[in-house]
Amino acid sequence: MPKRTDIHKIMVIGSGPIIIGQAAEFDYSGTQACLALREEGYEVVLVNSNPATIMTDTTIADKVYIEPLTVESISRIIRQEYPDAILPTLGGQVGLNMALSLAKTGILDELNIELLGTRLSSIEQAEDREKFKELCKELGEPVPPSTTVNTVEEALEFGDRIGYPIIVRPAFTMGGTGGGICNNHEELAKIAKNGLELSPVTECLIEKSIAGYKEIEFEVMRDHDDNAMIVCCMENFDPVGIHTGDSIVFSPSQTLSDKEYQMLRDCSLRLIRALKIEGGCNVQLALDPNSFDYDVIEVNPRVSRSSALASKATGYPIAKMAAKIAIGMTLDEIKNPVTRTTYAEFEPALDYVVCKIPRWPFDKFSKADRTLSTQMKATGEVMAIGRTAEEAMQKAVRSLEIDEKDLYSETAHHASDEEIEQKLVKAQDDRLFYLAEAFRRGYSLEDVHELTKINFYFLDIVSHMVEMEKNIQENKDNLETLRLAKKYGFSDATIATLWNESIDQVRDLRKKNGIIPVYKMVDTCAAEFESKTPYFYSTYDGENESHKSGKKSVIVIGSGPIRIGQGVEFDYATVHCVKALQKMGYEAIVINSNPETVSTDFSISDKLYFEPLTLEDVLNVCDLEKPEGVIVQFGGQTSINLAAGLKDHGIKILGTSVKDLNRAEDRELFDQIIKKLKLNQPKGLTATTHEGVIKAAEELGYPVLVRPSYVLGGKAMEIVYNKSELEEYLHDHVDIAADHPILVDDYLDGRECDVDAICDGQDVLLPGIMEHIEHAGVHSGDSMAVYPPQNFTDEVKDKIMDVTRKLALTLNCVGIMNIQFIVRNGEVYVIEVNPRASRTVPFLSKITGIEMAQVATRVIMGESLAQQGYSDGLAPEPEMISVKAPVFSFSKLADVDSYLGPEMKSTGEVMGSDHTFAKALYKAFAGAKMQLPENGNVLLTIEDKDKEKILPIAKRFARIGYRIFATKGTADFLKNNGLHVDLVTKVHESENADDNILNELREGRIDLVINTMGHDIEKNSDGFIIRQMAIQQNVPLLTALDTADALLTSLENRSFATDALK
């Protein structure tokens, strides 16, 4: 059926900020969908609250609204735009839930707006646990024994009757939010309560656990004419019981017999047809490893995280096809963009193995509960492609950018046998390394299978790699062993360690003997048809399929997996760098390892290499492509860290030189520049021993800011207020050495700001100054920020510009750089310089209209700012005011303290823009899901040092009609200052009393918590327990008084003043 001509304007709802369970894959799918609809001639209106994405670029849709994803906000846009239809199935769970909410308000019926793609009834049938179970019964498809509950009592009755373990799955949530495996009555009571609170419809499915079964996923497509096909089959390394987003995944499936595959394939096709889904969907199935019995776990009636992985694994662009199906086209009339000759109905065939490994945030959150279960905890993922499962897995491990570069872990090596067995039984993020260690110690496949229930085939892969380690070690400099090692994915670095040689010695031996990788094309059809995709992976098997084009080329290094501190913002900058290079006539080549992002869409760059971002893997591509040079400024710290190694091997680094990058990043060299330029800086000292750090802190005087050098996202950065806190910090965090010194800074309390500058060696363009709303001490990534700044005089702005210019020119910056300042009493202090793009680039680019990454790329390639039409200095400020607000994923990470400090904790961001600061704040808070009633109850739990500061804030809350609740110390202080306060008892006082602080939160009597008890970071401290309870109960929580002040500004502008005349 040809595309529909009765609709012309389509609204696409995006997925909002990045949180755990909903990451950059929806930027990728949303971008693809918008472009596909425009390609077919439709006018596209996009609504999304996330400024960090490519999706919210003005080139992606005809109209782009960066507005809160609330019913109120979207309804307003609908009445303004009058779209003919809405496409909600590409914005993750947020988009789906928003479509359901809009439908319930009646606005879609009132304005005769159609929902495209999968019908609402189908979405409800797939998402509503009880309706889905009934459908499976009708189809004769098996599901685990289960019941749907709306109360904790119902859950406990079922659990006690059917027996444990039990799995809790809340309805209409994402990433397993609120769910879990319960082994007894007490665990079920706790998890069911949490799950019911987090489900928007207060409903959970309680089912008998089938943990230990194989977990298989099918990505399925169906069109209006009932054509249906399988895009990809994926198999989880981990058995059922660990969320698929936290599982290692292989594609194609590795252990299914043809009979099992056909049986599960048929089941998936029956389900998508029965649900009448139009577009893409993800079917999760559990297979008993000892029989042909299987159970249906769930169906996601939309594009998902697995769809992005399947798209990159096969080269088949699922979101693009789903968008075209939504407008009435059928699979047999849509061309496959990879081959450009076959049609979309052909099922992809793979002649390689893909391995995905999740990237978890536990390097940031060392005290978090690392146990993996049915609730997702990973922030991102990496993907690697190889000819064997071993090669794919080894490449994926080294793509993770963690301490382990292969299957050897120093921590696992020093663990006792008892600790290793505990790690195998209770899955955590590092279980893979303990599996390898168990095999090194002689555990049999049977022993390890008994402890883990992981399939023998996957255990054999790990065991084989451990055997190969031994083989490599015993055959030093043997060429056959070297060939075999490379075939199975061993890196030069691992081989060098096993041979006790340098990496360059292994590399030289390999190259001298012609042991070099070939690059194979990802073509969707196992080379059956000619393919046009410039999408490649390396292997040491067969013929090379990637050839130099003859055009001048530039390699752009991506930013790797999404993690806290290095998010989708860097992918945004990478994509814009590619666009600028293409406009200048260069062949733009991307190297990246992240399957979720737009930069790894093969249609974005001229050539895509899906490779780990290690020196060896990047050099191999450089050896083949012989580029004009490599750009490292847009891939975050990942690419910057590769610059020196690339230069040492003769590769030209374009833009700021490696020497100057080092001058900005090395503390002592940077201090010399500050002194030479006579600039202000917080006093700081460097130490290389524990004793040296303590001495430095005493010399500067507490509080001090401590951190390692060369880090991103404030990793291991803390404000410490006394010697005992400093000793605990040193014990918890840090390996100190001469080449890894610790920086100790005097902590300055002032107003922080961020600038991104572009310098061509002569002129310096400052697109904007972003003022942080929180005072210094909260990491810039966790601060709310406003542009244009609201509290800086022209004199301060001039000083910032002057200092920026001096630093950019002295550091010989060519391209982009980021500087963070503290403004105190009209003086400007330099905190740090990052000689690369920062996470604020997308936000500033969108609100200033200056495509910063593109302008910087042109500068890097030799085009001056003047030639591009920009002059030296601060760019003119727009009339609109924009606020950026961070978004956190604390509900997914038990035991992570939500108190904000210098170490970054946010996973995403939203933006609010309007003509006044108060309205922009309101939108930013709404986008971050902090919508408060005009009057309600606020709980204040405040440190003594903040008591004076809380008084004006408390008075303002009282004035707009909020009731104030506080514990005795704060309550007495506020009462003495004339305020009415409701007293609550402390955490450990009369715990069962109705007015105990935790009971007040549990019973839903509190609308907002302001808690500044931050230094007490112990898990049993009152401050920590209150913060955890607020997050569990989904109560808005603020830990900085500046944020409370901003929230009040927003609330006051919604409330009427009620002042007596006298």
From Swiss-Prot:
Mn(2+) 2 binds at E298, N300. Its cofactor is Mg(2+); Mn(2+). Mn(2+) 3 binds at Q820, E832. ATP 1 binds at R129, R169, G175, G176, K208, I210, E215, G241, I242, H243, Q284, E298. It catalyses: hydrogencarbonate + L-glutamine + 2 ATP + H2O = carbamoyl phosphate + L-glutamate + 2 ADP + phosphate + 2 H(+). Mg(2+) 2 binds at E298, N300. Residues 930-1062 form the MGS-like domain. Mg(2+) 4 binds at E832, N834. Binds 4 Mg(2+) or Mn(2+) ions per subunit. Residues 402-546 are annotated as: Oligomerization domain. Residues 930-1062 are annotated as: Allosteric domain. Mn(2+) 4 binds at E832, N834. Composed of two chains; the small (or glutamine) chain promotes the hydrolysis of glutamine to ammonia, which is used by the large (or ammonia) chain to synthesize carbamoyl phosphate. Tetramer of heterodimers (alpha,beta)4. This is Carbamoyl phosphate synthase large chain.
